Amino acid sequence: MREDTKVYDITIIGGGPVGLFTAFYGGMRQASVKIIESLPQLGGQLSALYPEKYIYDVAGFPKIRAQELVDNLKEQMAKFDQTVCLEQAVESVEKQADGIFKLVTNKEIHYSKTVIITAGNGAFQPRKLELESAAQFENANLHYFIDDLNQFAGKRVAVLGGGDSAVDWALMLEPIAKEVSIIHRRDKFRAHEHSVENLRNSKVNVLTPFVPTELIGSERIEQIVIEEVKGERKEIIDVDDVIVNFGFVSSLGPIKNWGLEIEKNSIVVKSTMETNIEGFYAAGDICTYEGKVKLIASGFGEAPTAVNNAKAYMDPKARVQPLHSTSMFENK
């Protein structure tokens, strides 16, 4: 296993939006920063799950596409020369006798004076379509993740699911695809009422209460057989692509074994964002405290708190309260 013997000031576990802003802010405090991310790209769930969706609750943006927000955060972080390690899952974190943290991933050993974990809800995997033939089409036209809506231009698309993601994808695909069908096992959708109303008023073909029972095709899915729940109706739908939105299963995985105080699958932190382990901080959806609200906007506020207190932990003479950013960049 490779070993990076350089001891960084701050190592961030998780390269989602909060992790990216944490890395930028670490640069603001002149800290050497490393990000370790398990996915092949930065951006976390924004990039992996809904890059094309709009976000409406980030201060200063009436609306912003998820991937655009990630790109902006990456550009912001690029003001500093931060080290990024992709496709590395952190398996263990140990605070050594000398106070330095040793982080072991599936590929490499890292060392750091402090650690800030911004891993969202932990590792996440999509709930799969439980049909015998589903797996064979995953590299063809059965999708759990969507990178680019334009790949469905002029196509017949079936969306499976009844939550916010399923309804949102169906509505976004309507003006692009040739035909969109949404298939849900209940008559009532779990999505926000406004989205469901928009769905009912759209040209999307709503099929409820139906479940898929068979995928027909050789190398690609050509048709879906659906059957009515507690009924006798059966239909066959011609498709070019199938999008599965049954939600995701998230897990803290090995994080539970790192000696951190865990409460309801979240890491307990103090007002300084420090965990029960001195020098180990958390920010974003991964952490909890009294009154915690799990929003990207909240995580953006927690990141500077974690970094500034990590800086003071490393150097007790350092100010927790930083200079204003305008005074730091106006001459650069």
Curated annotation (Swiss-Prot):
The keyword Nucleotide-binding does not apply. Gene3D superfamilies: FAD/NAD(P)-binding domain. FAD binds at E37, Q45, Y50, V90, F124, D285, T326. It catalyses: 2 reduced [2Fe-2S]-[ferredoxin] + NADP(+) + H(+) = 2 oxidized [2Fe-2S]-[ferredoxin] + NADPH. Coiled coil: none annotated. The keyword Oxidoreductase applies. Binds 1 FAD per subunit. GO terms for molecular function: ferredoxin-NADP+ reductase activity; flavin adenine dinucleotide binding; NADP binding. Its EC number is 1.18.1.2. Its cofactor is FAD. Keywords: FAD, Flavoprotein, NADP, Oxidoreductase. Signal peptide: none annotated. PANTHER family: THIOREDOXIN REDUCTASE 1-RELATED-RELATED. Homodimer. Belongs to the ferredoxin--NADP reductase type 2 family. This is Ferredoxin--NADP reductase 2. It comes from Bacillus licheniformis (strain ATCC 14580 / DSM 13 / JCM 2505 / CCUG 7422 / NBRC 12200 / NCIMB 9375 / NCTC 10341 / NRRL NRS-1264 / Gibson 46).
